[in-house]
Amino acid sequence: MSSTYKLNHTDSFANGDAKSLLPNPENGFTHLTSLAQSEKAVQELLLQQTPMQATDDHLVEFSEALRTVAKALRGAAEGKALAQAEAAEWKRRYELERSKNVELQHKELSNGVCADESNGQRMEHLAKSPRLYAQEISSNGMETICSHEVLQDGGFNSFNNKLKRKASFKLSWGCKGMANDQHKKEIVSFERGNISTAERSSKQISLTWESDPQTVLIITKPNSTSVRVLSVDMVRWLRTQKGLNIYVEPRVKEELLSESSSFNFVQTWEDDKEISLLHTKVDLLITLGGDGTVLWAASMFKGPVPPIVPFSMGSLGFMTPFHSEQYRDCLEAILKGPISITLRHRLQCHIIRDKATHEYEPEETMLVLNEVTIDRGISSYLTNLECYCDNSFVTCVQGDGLILSTTSGSTAYSLAAGGSMVHPQVPGILFTPICPHSLSFRPLILPEHVTVRVQVPFNSRSSAWVSFDGKDRKQLEAGDALVCSMAPWPVSTACQVESTNDFLRSIHDGLHWNLRKTQSADGP
């Protein structure tokens, strides 16, 4: 190419510039010295043109390289902008959700009042307005939480003139073997610049009735003859011997009336609106069945849940410590009080759809007592789930799915997937993968105050499916997200002895945990 470039310049010089250097033939003479000078000038010009050609070649190559780099930088900038826009969108949705939860909590707390009145003033105050939970210190220095709510009958047309006031109670936290009152009143102390914490695991929660319970709700396991026989006997005993008002499910009321017309005193509900007001009526909830019956009973209450007394009449029960054969003695002791209870935390979950038409359009909030499961369903592809904890990236799940479990659900699906068994009163969220395609993917236990977001990325090969305590199955498309956090309303279940004793006994009896023949003492 350079030779062609020289040739072109030579032709141009011969056709134009050379003529200007030679003498005009019309003058009649030719000077040899002038011709030699002309040839020398041509050689000098050729020498000057050669480095110019090389410089032009380098400039062309450099400009092409700059265009290539600019194109690559432009593509990277566009990709980064898209990623930042997507992250900003999820952050905005999360902040809107969090602010909404904070507003709801402030509204709930604003309805509460401190319990500083005397007993006479307290009853007068209860007649005027309901009070939620207020913390106080009892006369013996024990930390308590009182719950007083006035029963309002306006929501039930069929329940008028049935009941005027709901029973009140208080909860007490007691430390074993701790004589120092400081550990009874404070979780964290910082006296004299020294930080100390009380041992929360040693605290057993007790429920003491301040007024007699008046209303009991009984939830039964369906399609069981033994449960039906026991429910008939229990309803009759609670009514005739204890004078309590009885609520049952519509199905159970029909069964009781078919048994005898004398059960016409039993009350029930007709629609979801009446169910939503049950917590203002019911003082105690009794379940006859297994853990599934407890889950069903808890799912009926989208807010506060009355204390539950679970009787074991199922195949396996980690939350049902009471035996049905001694139900009268058990209920006598519970109605009299005080009783030890286990506070079982729940998760509140909702789905945010990518195709939502408004800025913030979540679906109905679901409450789970055991776990929420995200799996691949019938798809032959692995699930691809991006997981975040308070907007911090956790990991990308590639496997059969993921389990977000409460500590009460640690002995259920999470245990089968390799998760640890955790005491139900330990507040936390279990993060357990289902058959992950990674040897290093081990389960996690996250603190109770975090918010976990699981979303299906846009490049996922398939959708995912989510279920809440094994029901209400929903599909998650690409771009959809599931947001889970700890619910403000726990489920309190009565203990036969105390919380830790019941938990250890349940894993020994239900799972035969660490059951092995004892090694003989006369070994080799």
Swiss-Prot record:
Protein name according to UniProt: NAD(H) kinase 1
Renumbered residue ranges of the record's region Disordered: 1-25
GO molecular function: ATP binding; NAD+ kinase activity; NADH kinase activity
GO biological process: NAD metabolic process; NADP biosynthetic process
Organismal lineage: Eukaryota, Viridiplantae, Streptophyta, Embryophyta, Tracheophyta
Induction notes from the record: By gamma radiation, hydrogen peroxide and infection by P.syringae.
Enzyme category, top tier: transferase
Functional summary from the UniProt entry: Phosphorylates both NAD(+) and NADH, with a twofold preference for NADH. Source of the cellular reductant NADPH which is an important antioxidant factor.
Tissue: Ubiquitous.
Catalysed reaction equations from the record: NAD(+) + ATP = ADP + NADP(+) + H(+); NADH + ATP = ADP + NADPH + H(+)
Organism: Arabidopsis thaliana
Domain of life the protein comes from: Eukaryota
Gene3D superfamilies from the UniProt entry: Probable inorganic polyphosphate/atp-NAD kinase, domain 1 (3.40.50.10330), Probable inorganic polyphosphate/atp-NAD kinase, domain 2 (2.60.200.30)
EC number: 2.7.1.23, 2.7.1.86
